[in-house]
């Protein structure tokens, strides 16, 4: 019997825990069951109390104190410890039925999704046939305010694509906190970010305004040392790097974003629908036969 899950990922501040809370609330309102797992060993406050919390196994504070690691190293240590104690996950999940949506709230340290093989190993363990057999979807959140800074947006998008390639499971990319960009970005302009391409850099109004203000030509003076420029991150080399990153993302043609506003119930419902489609949740549910109360009453009479 298959189980179903969504692993919620993204950089720090993307609104992962807030989205998990909104999703659980929506599921409860629609009489669907959720099993909430917190895998962030540094998280302390939750709107919905986790059904399973990694801090019951190991906390980031304990890892840092006992092993003498920093925050990022401590986080990696916590996940390595988790991978050595996977029975802790199995015992909690193996009794769940296919009616549950397992929601896994992940930490925001990006190296987990890009640099180390721990998460791919964890996803493989959860999804392999056997006692768990979880049909997993990866849900990657990127804060919508990133669209204001296009270099930052493409950097975040590159991380999302890296996670897609690493995990090799159905993947949904989300622009979260849409309520924060209302009035800042026109709907027509925002639509272009849903399928990123190099053209976004060509039409960057911030870069265009800067060039007019500084009276620059198409390229900066590369003879200047980086420390002689007002800002190192706005030179010709930086622009070429951004263009290379954007070109790489466009060449893969893998990234499409969906919009999320957790304050809007319809928006949360739409994201849940995408998740259900990815993991084929409804196809696995037993068909429910209609109950004809009148016929039942006649039969009983």
Curated annotation (Swiss-Prot):
Physiological role: Small GTPase required for proper nuclear import of RNA polymerase II and III (RNAPII and RNAPIII). May act at an RNAP assembly step prior to nuclear import.
Any Pfam family hit: ATP_bind_1
GO MF, one example: GTPase activity
Binding-site residues for GTP, renumbered to this chain: 13-18, 176-179
Motif (Gly-Pro-Asn (GPN)-loop): 70-72
Family: Belongs to the GPN-loop GTPase family.
Spans annotated as Disordered: 212-232
Skewed-composition ranges (Basic and acidic residues): 223-232
Quaternary structure note: Heterodimers with GPN1 or GPN2. Binds to RNA polymerase II (RNAPII).
Highest taxon of source: Eukaryota
InterPro entries reported in the protein's UniProt record: Gpn, Gpn3, P-loop_NTPase
Keywords, in A-Z order: GTP-binding, Hydrolase, Nucleotide-binding
CDD domains in alphabetical order: GPN3
Site residues (Stabilizes the phosphate intermediate), renumbered to this chain: 72
Protein known as: GPN-loop GTPase 3
């Amino acid at each position: 019997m298959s189980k179903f899950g969504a692993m919620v990922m993204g950089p720090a501040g993307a609104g992962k825990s807030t989205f998990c809370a909104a999703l659980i609330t929506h599921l409860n309102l629609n009489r669907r069951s959720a099993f909430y797992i917190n895998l962030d060993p540094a998280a302390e406050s939750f709107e919905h109390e986790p059904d399973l919390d990694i801090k019951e196994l190991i906390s980031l504070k304990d890892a840092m104190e006992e092993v003498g690691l920093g925050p990022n190293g401590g986080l990696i240590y916590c996940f390595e410890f988790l991978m050595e104690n996977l029975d802790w996950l199995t015992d909690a999940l193996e009794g769940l039925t296919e009616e549950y949506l397992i929601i896994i709230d992940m930490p925001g340290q990006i190296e987990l999704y890009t640099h180390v093989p721990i998460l791919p190993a964890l996803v493989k363990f959860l999804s392999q046939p056997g006692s768990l057999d979880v049909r997993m979807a990866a849900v990657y959140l990127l804060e919508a305010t990133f669209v204001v800074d296009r270099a930052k947006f493409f950097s975040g998008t590159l991380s999302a694509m890296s996670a897609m390639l690493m995990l090799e499971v159905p993947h949904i990319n989300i622009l979260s906190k849409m309520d924060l960009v209302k009035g800042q970005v026109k709907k027509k302009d925002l639509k272009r970010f849903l399928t990123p391409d190099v053209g976004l850099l060509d039409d960057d109004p911030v870069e265009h305004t800067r060039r007019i203000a500084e009276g620059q030509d198409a390229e900066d003076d590369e003879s200047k040392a980086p420390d002689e420029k007002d800002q190192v991150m706005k030179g010709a080399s930086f622009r070429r790097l951004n263009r290379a990153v954007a070109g790489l993302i466009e060449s893969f043609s893998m990234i499409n974003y969906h919009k999320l506003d957790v304050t809007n119930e319809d928006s949360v419902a739409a994201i849940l629908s995408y998740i259900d489609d990815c993991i084929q949740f409804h196809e696995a549910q037993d068909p429910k036969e209609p109950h004809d109360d009148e016929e039942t009453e006649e039969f009983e009479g």
